[in-house]
Amino acid sequence: MLGVVGVVALAFAALCLTAWLGQRRLLFPASKLGEEPRMEGATLTKVTAPSGRTVYALHVPPKKQGSVTIVHFHGNAEELGQLTPLAWSFRRAGLGFFAVEYPGYGLA
């Protein structure tokens, strides 16, 4: 009986250790490769910060001048290349769309 309990305890300890060591990848899954957003009428701008880091921004102007532009900051598991459908939705509604890629994500 003690042998079975020991094996279960060892397996549980191994599972806990694996979860602890891989917690950053479990909580903050990063994309494998940054995908450049492709959308008609969109502008992808590359800005180099004073620190030397590169930041990208996606701008889709509104259909009519003077219309509202939505500023969007994506979540941890997203990147600019995945925001094209969202940008299209706002564009169809007559709104502009502006999003910035966080340093270390996607294209940056």
What does each model-identified segment do?
Residues 4, 8-48:
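An N-terminal hydrophobic leader/cap segment in hydrolases
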